[in-house]
Amino acid sequence: ESVKFWAKEYHIDGFRFDLMGIHDIDTMNQLREELLKIDPTIFVYGEGWVAADSPLPFEQRAVKENVRKMKGIAVFNDEFRDGLKGSTFDEQEPGYASGNINGHFEPVKYGIVGGTQHPQVDYSGLLYCDGPYAAAPSQMINFVSCHDGYTLVDKLKLSVQGEHSEEELVPIDKLIHTVLLTSQGIPFIRGGEEIMQDKQGEPNSYKSSDAVNQIDWALKAKNRDIFNYIRTLIALRKKHPAFRIPTAEGLEKWLHFLDTGDSGVIAYTLGEYANGDEWKEILVAYNGNRNQADINIPEQDWIIVCHNGQIDLDSQEHLSGGDISIAASSALILYRQ
């Protein structure tokens, strides 16, 4: 009744449930059905876990493992979060994008396919679960930081190994957002993340002052390069439906991972004008290593959209394929017409 009131009287168009797992599946489904009657575009999502134990039997809990039973409801993808940036529970552990490839390869791929079933993902290599739990990519929210825990830049300061300045974290930050905004599913960005906002190293800032929690708008000028980079990634995603495939069947048909050997690079193609895209084939590759990596890609007349930390949707720079090098902590996005 409360949710219906907020939707009708205040026209709230999205509801996020903290610790959604303490609710039962039937209640969440009833809530979703009632909201559909008011406005079918209302978005419902939540944390697909509980803080401790619950008297509800596991099969009745509205947790991520049961999200297939909750059509039209999405959950946060903690596999992708911790695979990409490093453990939320160990502040010093780096993730895939910070050079910690082993143990984080498959969780990142899991996010790329929106938490759905895909024949090229090894689900035994995941961090917290042993299989796909989303029926469709729209049930999966990929993210790396939110109000809980460290901001992304604070986490990187703590976990990236070796001496480094904040400026030296920019390539890793760009790589993380490239993976986030080119993966299937729903991308989630914490406010301020796009300008490298920190919280002065405070992981639990609900009790902190505005000096810690407010957005420092001067960072938009200081970090204009990464702001523009992320803005262009968003434009790429909005323009190209290949990055927004709606079904698991479509992902299995159009998204294919490339064999990159032991390079540590994750690479895949989106082919056959995926999901009605104007580009015939798109190739995306991520190098999480802290050094250059070499891979082999199909020999085609590719046009370079993103490389070496730069992105240009109107680029006319060509690449013929074959053996190529990808700069440390960077992504490569190509397409052919």
Language-model-detected regions and their locations in the chain:
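Active-site neighborhood of glycoside hydrolase catalytic domains
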Residues: E1-P55
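Carbohydrate-interacting/catalytic domains
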Residues: E167-V170, L181-Q337
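Conserved alpha/beta catalytic core and glycan-binding cleft of carbohydrate-active enzymes
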Residues: R32-E34, I38-M196, N204-Y206, D262, ...
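The substrate-binding groove and active-site-proximal loops of carbohydrate-active enzymes
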Residues: I12-H23, K157-E168, Q214-K220
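Non-transmembrane alpha-helical segments in soluble domains
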Residues: V3-A7, R32, I141-V144, H177-L181, ...
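A short acidic (Asp/Glu
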Residues: T27-N29, P55-P57, Q200-G201, I295-N296
